[in-house]
Amino acid sequence: MKYFVVALALVAAFACIAESKPAESEHELAEVEEENELADLEDAVWLEHLADLSDLEEARGFFGNTWKKIKGKADKIMLKKAVKIMVKKEGITKEEAQAKVDAMSKKQIRLYLLKYYGKKALQKASEKL
């Protein structure tokens, strides 16, 4: 269970990176240059390097693709978990449980798993008290 939580945290981190703000535009850098009255050539070179931040766009694309892969694998794991839980909880065959899960939307599957693991966590917490 804790591996699932860690994986979920990583997915959230990748999503935040993928949704992050794009690099500053040349126009914004020109405004900064005017505000700071940069006369020094080294400062101007530094600002040019800031304007050439295409690596951030490439990284964002990489994390976006990675996010999609992780999300796909997480969805497959959730489907398998939902089938296992239904077989155990309802006492039906694996094929029947698979048919029920296939009929459910991804949102319904997530809610089903959250309810199951929420009840399980509540029971463990009440036992410790």
From Swiss-Prot:
Cleavage of the propeptide depends on the processing quadruplet motif (XXXR, with at least one of X being E). Residues 21-60 form a propeptide. The keyword Secreted applies. InterPro entries: Latarcin_precursor (IPR018802). Expressed by the venom gland. Residues 1-20 form the signal peptide. GO terms for biological process: defense response to Gram-negative bacterium; defense response to Gram-positive bacterium; killing of cells of another organism. One of its GO terms (molecular function) is toxin activity. The keyword Transmembrane helix does not apply. Its main location: secreted. GO terms for cellular component: extracellular region. It is found in: Secreted. Coiled coil: none annotated. Keywords: Antibiotic, Antimicrobial, Cytolysis, Hemolysis, Secreted, Signal, Toxin. A motif (Processing quadruplet motif) lies at residues 57-60. Belongs to the cationic peptide 06 (cytoinsectotoxin) family. Insecticidal, cytolytic and antimicrobial peptide. Forms voltage-dependent, ion-permeable channels in membranes. At high concentration causes cell membrane lysis. Both the N-terminus (61-94) and the C-terminus (99-129) of the mature peptide form alpha-helices which probably disrupt target cell membranes. The linker region (95-98) probably derives from a processing quadruplet motif (PQM), found in propeptides of many zodatoxins, hinting at a fusion of two originally separate membrane-active peptides. This is M-zodatoxin-Lt8d. The lineage of its organism: Eukaryota, Metazoa, Ecdysozoa, Arthropoda, Chelicerata.
